[in-house]
Amino acid sequence: MARREGEVTETLLKKSTENRGEDRDGLGMKEKVWRESKKLWVVAGPAIFTRFSTSGLSLISQAFIGHLGSTELAAYSITLTVLLRFSNGILLGMASALETLCGQAYGAKQYHMLGIYLQRSWIVLTGCTICLMPIYIFAGPILLALGQEERLVRVARIIALWVIGINISFVPSFTCQMFLQAQSKNKIIAYVAAVSLGVHVFLSWLLVVHFDFGIAGAMTSSLVAHWLPNIAQVLFVTCGGCTETWRGFSWLAFKDLWPVFKLSVSSGGMICLELWYNSILILLTGNLKNAEVALNALAICININALEMMVAFGFMAAASVRVSNEIGSGNSNGAKFATMVVVSTSLSIGIIFFFIFLFLRERVSYIFTTSEAVATQVADLSPLLAFSILLNSIQPVLSGVAVGAGWQKYVTVVNLACYYLVGIPSGLFLGYVVGLQVKGVWLGMIFGIFVQTCVLTVMTMRTDWDQQVSSSLKRLNRWVEPESPSRNQTLQNE
């Protein structure tokens, strides 16, 4: 064992030394930025499109269910907002550990380890999904305990049982996305996402409108639309699309599960604290004066912000992939340069959106409402919306850098402190004590994001990238397995 680990270390050090020389290639700054930008957009472009397509699945279901009745629409919205968003955040966060592991292993040219990491992540996330299943099975009592009306709960608990299949679909969906992104092969994800979107529209019309199957028809279409891209991705991975990185099912997937689980939990905590933050914002404004108008205006602003966040999350994925690849390859300067390029690109786009929404003000609200009172409130909130969009062009990207470098544990603490010890108390104070109402609540929570962004910026600027390469090397040295496993370890030959 010691001899094998020594050989692995020697191999990785050799590759690390070779890759450090890549910076001395004689290219000027303009050429380097252009080359890095192309690598960046190979990941970011498909990731952004996939995010929009995935969000489109829920919007399409919501549109067709909305025609069945207001009770059905409210029940569907509650199920997705309260139950699915909760479990989605946990699974997406835990799957992001795969970005760190696969990205660094791919950069180190330990290609065979990507398939093993993928299988380990399948095992960890499947166990997590089973643990989350009771929230859907007992959705009725849970929603009643949260104060929802009984007539809504009767419909919601039926929808919740259908959503179990969607929740399970997140396991292959998130893990295969991370696996393919690490290799910059995520175009296939965008293609199948586009196909599933079209299939969902057709099936929803056929089952809900033409055959009048109601909720059962809408949820059947949603299940098919969620599983179709998963089947395509798994087939692509296992049937020849990733010959270097997929060597077949292996017993090694059951080895070193505890370290993978710990990294997954750290990643889950980091992402969940971010995804649940806006949900808490909605809850905090529910008891304010003129709450209906405030909530409608805030919902419009959050929907606009969420659309822009799709772009930011695309750059977050690109940052994670580029940083992890460069760290894994031993190119510390490359990791630093990739960080600078992705942050600059995302910030430039954020500045454009900042001025667009700052000057559009209430005009954009008429896309969502005809109420003058709501439009006026949106105009009042537009500076906060514009500033949120500007911060969102930086903060998720820095989180992506953290994922690529493997800092999830530290960023979880930062998120907890900035969001829940700074942002929420500030929002409560400004909204309820000072009396700024919804503007005060949002302003306080933006302050939490601002503090978090400042902390992550300082962390990134003070990072010793050579030390990050060394830490990555140690992790690879601990977890890497022989490139040609013996027959008793492999379930499927190459």
From Swiss-Prot:
Pfam families: MatE. InterPro entries: MATE_euk, MATE_fam. Keywords: Membrane, Transmembrane, Transmembrane helix, Transport. It is found in: Membrane. It is a multi-pass membrane protein. The chain crosses the membrane at residues 40-60, 74-94, 123-143, 158-178, 188-208, 223-243, 268-288, 297-317, 340-360, 384-404, 416-436, 441-461. One of its GO terms (molecular function) is xenobiotic transmembrane transporter activity. Residues 1-25 are annotated as: Disordered. GO terms for biological process: xenobiotic detoxification by transmembrane export across the plasma membrane. It comes from the Eukaryota. GO terms for cellular component: membrane. Its main location: membrane. The keyword Transport applies. PANTHER family: MULTIDRUG RESISTANCE PROTEIN. NCBIfam families: matE. Belongs to the multi antimicrobial extrusion (MATE) (TC 2.A.66.1) family. This is Protein DETOXIFICATION 23.
